[in-house]
Swiss-Prot record:
The active site is at 227. The keyword Lyase does not apply. Binds 2 Zn(2+) ions per subunit. Binds 2 Calcium ions per subunit. Expressed specifically in the enamel organ. Its cofactor is Zn(2+); Ca(2+). It comes from Sus scrofa (Pig). Zn(2+) 2 binds at residues 176, 178, 191, 204. This is Matrix metalloproteinase-20. Residues 1-22 form the signal peptide. CDD domains: HX, ZnMc_MMP. Zn(2+) 1 binds at residues 100, 226, 230, 236. Hemopexin repeats lie at residues 293-343, 344-389, 391-439, 440-483. It is an enzyme of class 3 (hydrolase).
């Protein structure tokens, strides 16, 4: 696995020429075929097998027969072909494949400086979209492509909607101001800059291409995942099964796992991702910390409440309390970062879908997924659920097991999300107090337990009977943790 130089630019290229069914080795076809193949090969070798120094990508640098034979041999060796120095059919087959355009030659396996990001949380922004796909599809493709890398290393990607991000993503046409113009359909597909200031990490896609989430056209997830590898500091791999192999090959976005070679390469830069498979650390008694919230105060409330396995979790500021459902003993506070480092503090909402073994934690316009206490990839955007853009945060969430609906509370309204269909129900949002008789005030947290929904609003917890459609009792919120 190679690592991209700090000044490196990677471009994904697809040749538009068709295969010649009658072309034997050494151009023994028509003179036109021979000339076309020769010029195509010369351009390819100059682009990918010349150490260009300060030259722009794609610039013609070296000429001459002996130099070309040497480059052909380099190409053949890189792709595991029989090394002859001749432009035989197999070699031309490789030359005509769709591929990424970062050169295949380098002075070192790890380039001088080993360019990489110096922080673990990176921002990204999609500033321009393509008409080939809906914005939601583009958002999803980019998120999944970044998640492919964060699953292997301790990097998190947070999407922002304004300002300058570490990784600026856009769909461009022609000359777009970075000295690497696009050339229309079936030419250069995309390019990405290595980690660094300014253009570092930025990833551009040719808007003239037909982008899809399927096998037709060019699969955006496949190209984006490859280019983000460059944006994180990787060059090409000689392993044909690797995502960072130079030639384009469709990858199914769903169920994709980063190949071993790519894992090895990215972990050489950033180290392996630490997983949290066990139980969180619980101190042997309340921490002696003056900033610990006084949860037993008469006015105290919770930010979020959720089931997690057979336990209940209660969140407040940077602390959470953990208790067995039917036991009130052994309840102790712990910092959120001790078990959920990426959440830090101030969780807005949380809920569990027990049938999937997954829990969802919300903070601002983002959410995280866990299996038990193990984080599953980077943060995602709440707009995946179908929220309108004016919704910036979720106040509370509760999953109803019988109906497989999840209710999201925002202000004095709530939304209903169908977990089976993975989309919002129609005719929402609705007014919370009108739909849930007896529940007053803004909902801070909610959880379903033993057929009841418990709504937490300030210091009160309303026990709501879903069959009677009414509140049957009102408790103190902090009574749930022994106050």
């Amino acid at each position: 696995m190679k690592v991209l130089p700090a000044s490196g630019l990677a471009v994904l290229l697809v040749t538009a020429l068709k295969f010649s069914a009658a072309a034997p080795s050494l151009f023994a076809a028509t003179p036109r075929t021979s000339r076309n193949n020769y010029h195509l090969a010369q351009a390819y070798l100059d682009k990918y097998y010349t150490k260009k120094g300060g030259h722009q990508v794609g610039e013609m640098v070296a000429k001459g027969g002996n130099s070309m034979v040497k480059k052909i041999k380099e190409l053949q060796a890189f792709f595991g072909l029989r090394v002859t120095g001749k432009l035989d059919r197999t070699t031309m087959d490789v030359i005509k494949r769709p591929r990424c355009g970062v050169p295949d030659v380098a002075n070192y396996r790890l380039f001088p400086g080993e360019p990489k990001w110096k922080k673990n949380t990176l921002t990204y922004r999609i500033s321009k979209y393509t008409p080939s796909m809906t914005p939601a599809e583009v958002d999803k493709a980019m998120e999944m492509a970044l998640q492919a890398w964060s699953s292997a290393v301790p990097l998190s990607f947070v999407r922002v909607n304004a300002g300058e991000a570490d990784i600026m993503i856009s769909f461009e046409t022609g000359d777009h101001g970075d000295s690497y113009p696009f050339d229309g359909p079936r030419g250069t597909l995309a390019h990405a800059f290595a980690p660094g200031e300014g253009l570092g990490g930025d990833t551009h896609f040719d808007n003239a291409e037909k982008w899809t989430m399927g096998m037709n056209g060019f699969n955006l997830f496949t190209v984006a995942a490859h280019e983000f590898g460059h944006a994180l500091g990787l060059a090409h791999s000689t392993d044909p099964s690797a995502l960072m192999y130079p030639t384009y090959k469709y990858q199914n976005p769903y169920g994709f796992h980063l190949p071993k070679d790519d894992v090895k390469g990215i972990q050489a830069l950033y180290g392996p991702r630490k997983t949290f498979t066990g139980k969180p650390t619980v101190p042997h008694g309340p921490p002696h910390n003056p900033s610990l919230p006084d949860i037993c105060d008469s006015s105290s409330s919770f930010d979020a409440v959720t089931m997690l396995g057979k336990e209940l979790l209660f969140f407040r500021d940077r602390i959470f309390w953990r208790r067995q459902v039917h036991l009130m003993s052994g309840i102790r506070p712990s910092t959120i970062t001790s078990s959920f480092p990426q959440l830090m503090s101030n969780v807005d909402a949380a809920y569990e879908v027990a049938d999937r073994g997954m829990a969802y934690f919300f903070k601002g316009p983002h959410y995280w997924i866990t299996r038990g206490f193990q984080m599953q990839g980077p943060p995602r955007t709440i707009y995946d659920f179908g929220f309108p853009r004016y919704v910036q945060r979720i106040d509370a969430a509760v999953h109803l097991k019988d109906t497989q609906k999840t209710l999201f509370f925002v202000g004095d309204e709530y939304y209903s999300y169908d977990e089976r269909k993975r989309k919002m129900d129609k005719d929402y949002p609705k007014n919370t107090e009108e739909e849930f008789s007896g529940v007053n005030g803004q909902i801070d947290a909610a959880v379903e337990l033993n057929g009841y929904i418990y709504f937490f609003s300030g210091p009160k917890a309303y026990k709501y009977d879903t069959e009677k459609e009414d509140v049957v009792s009102v408790l103190k919120s902090n009574s749930w943790i022994g106050c």
